[in-house]
Amino acid sequence: MAKEKFERNKPHVNIGTIGHVDHGKTSLTAAITKVLAKTGGATFLAYDQIDKAPEERERGITISTAHVEYQTKNRHYAHVDCPGHADYVKNMITGAAQMDGAILVVSAADGPMPQTREHILLARQVGVPYIVVFLNKVDMLDDPELRELVEMEVRDLLKKYEFPGDSIPIIPGSALKALEGDTSDIGEGAILKLMAAVDEYIPTPQRATDKPFLMPVEDVFSIAGRGTVATGRVERGKIKVGEEVEIVGIRPTQKTVITGVEMFRKLLDEGMAGDNIGALLRGLKREDLERGQVLANWGSINPHTKFKAQVYVLSKEEGGRHTPFFKGYRPQFYFRTTDVTGTVKLPDNVEMVMPGDNIAIEVELITPVAMEKELPFAIREGGRTVGAGVVADIIA
């Protein structure tokens, strides 16, 4: 059977379910597909079809993730759901599933639990910009005052991690009832209300082509009679012949002008996000730049050496370290196209970090790298990946 063409007639948004184990993330995902299937916006997927998500490898890390797609009247969604807590941690830190927004599922019967807190913290650290809350299992609560209490607790927790707790939509309902075909306010009605809140509250993300231009340099050539060419894949934005760019990272920042853009040996008017291009640079010699630097719009990104990060350390089974590391650990940090050595500083109350841990650290690199919040990186020892991380904050 021929593959259906992906219709781009609606804006596309990436979302996912987050929250404590057994609070109903996967049941909610199944319920959304069931309810939207009625209007032709989804194919119904039962709980066990979502729960047995296949394992994937992202930057050397094994992650189980279920990918579900559906659409509302206004939008097309790609939705990720992870079976296990460790999968969420890895997924969010590696950026394997970039989320434009998340649905936080909280059981009304239990209230916020340790993983509720951890997922909200991770969402804050890795830059998930918006959260909508589904207060699940409300059929198990008779007392409306208790429900209000849980709601207040959730709002306070969100505020603690700098989300706008007072204005975030909280939709009460029961994913199980919706799956059983209950058409009341807490069943199907709640799912429709949730999707309306997601449609309205989570903005359509800015497309990569609309952001300021950035291209990591993979290679540098000199072409006789033409000059110096930097090759790489455009990460975001667009670049036209005649535009001025900065070369950022590793060495002092330099400015230059793009005098040509080539792709597959053909000249282009402009290169855009996703294109593998060669950019001809005015007035530069082959030795003036190197792999690991980036070409970028003036002033759009700066070089830094000190940052805070959230990292996941690979377990021994994933091919990571067999032993813990301590403060002063000096691995290589792989950003975009290059490794830079850096020293790790651990939080005050942490003596050592075990393989399989998820931890907030501070890093100081020996050379500056073009960096911004939410930039993912790998931690390597002698070319072998031992961890993955994301920049949570820039210090210097």
From Swiss-Prot:
GO terms for molecular function: GTP binding; GTPase activity; translation elongation factor activity. Transmembrane segments: none annotated. Residues 60-64 are annotated as: G2. The keyword Protein biosynthesis applies. Its EC number is 3.6.5.3. PANTHER family: ELONGATION FACTOR TU, MITOCHONDRIAL, ELONGATION FACTOR TU-RELATED. One of its GO terms (cellular component) is cytosol. GTP binds at residues 19-26, 81-85, 136-139. Residues 174-176 are annotated as: G5. PROSITE patterns: G_TR_1, G_TR_2. Signal peptide: none annotated. Disulfide bonds: none annotated. Residues 19-26 are annotated as: G1. Mg(2+) binds at residue 26. Its main location: cytoplasm. Monomer. This is Elongation factor Tu. Residues 136-139 are annotated as: G4. GTP hydrolase that promotes the GTP-dependent binding of aminoacyl-tRNA to the A-site of ribosomes during protein biosynthesis. Keywords: Cytoplasm, Elongation factor, GTP-binding, Hydrolase, Magnesium, Metal-binding, Nucleotide-binding, Protein biosynthesis.
